[in-house]
Structures are given as structure tokens and as C-alpha cells.
Amino acid sequence: MALRLLDFADEWDSRLVTDAVDWLATVAPAEGGAAFVEPSVAEGPHAPWWVPEQGHPASLIQTGQIAGVLYARGFSHPWLDRATEVMWSRIETLSAPSGYEMFGVLAFLQHVPDRARATAAFARVGPLLLAGGLVALDPSAGGEVHSPLAFAPLPSSLARGLFSEAVIEAHLDHLAGAQGEDGGWMFNWPSWSAAAEADWRGFLTVDALRVLRANGRA
């Protein structure tokens, strides 16, 4: 979340990011990349779904999203080299991803420098979004669902071509209308603490404004 906010706000600090990725390399799984959560999460309060995976494997969710924003910023680091190997290996065998895993996959494919390989990989895994029922095409769908804008937030997004213009416009209308009285946006998954809710609402508000602006909804 932190790296993405630095990117969204155009407050990228190369020294700060280098320190963060240096640390990330010290806790990386044996194969490279980033775990979903570190075992140390158990030492304090945390979301109930923050459960360390047995064997400390790399996570598509975390590895892909971190690698994606680093590539978008032209960042280089040995951690990123190994993370890239992990992502290509996982994407080659991807068959039934979760929606959250696809966030990582798409972030990586959107920005990885090998564009020919990324385009070919997306042609295979992109349709899994629809085939796997990972996207709620109805803007009014309730529960913990993923909007097309979650996977294709910008006109330049790789996944934008999977959805009709009418679907995108309907979801933009819904996003604009979901702004709360305090000016912020709320998430659609369980809120387990006031602190976490404040953190996520802040992030999603910045993201919602970014998406609306990029799609001509000033």
C-alpha cells in the first residue's frame, strides 16, 4: 500500500524506497519475491485473514503489486530481479487464480519491461478474470466483489479491453456516487478495527480520485 500511495501521489522518494526494498530482501522467501504476510504478524493485532502460509512461499498478490509499482517507477534492485523470475514462473502455470492474485498478476504484467512476453502472458491469463467469475459486472452487486475498475482502472490498463465501454461507464458512475458525506470512499470487505478502516479508507479515497480523474470524471 505504501509504495502505491507514493506512486499515486507522485511523492516517490528513491532513497526511502531503496531502504524499504533492502529490508524486503532480508525477509524474502527462499525463492524470492514477497510472502503474503510475515510470520511476525502473529506477534501483534492483525486482520483475521492475515495468516502466514506454511513454508513461507512467495505471494502473487504481494510480489506482483510491489514489482509492478517498482517497474512503473524505473526502479532496479536485486530483489526485483528475483521477484520477476518468481512472477514469470507462476504466471506460466496459472489456471485458477483468486481475484486478489490477479491484482498482483496484472500489476506486474502492466509494467514489466519485457512487453512482448507480458502481452503474450496477458492473452492467456487475462480471460481468466471473466471465466473464473472474478469480476462483478453489475455495479450494484453487494458483498466482497471486485469491480472491473479494480482490474482495469485506467484507459491504458491491459484488462480494459475485456470490458465494454458501457460496463466501464456504469462502474464509473457507481464509483462517483459511492463517495461518502465526508468526501471519502468505503471498502466492501469486513472492517476489523477502526485503525485499519481509517488506513484503507484513506488509500481507497486517493485511488478513487485517481481513477475518476484518469477516466475524465474530474
Question: What annotation goes with each model-predicted range?
Answer:
Residues 1-218:
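Preference for long, amphipathic alpha-helical scaffolds in soluble/luminal domains
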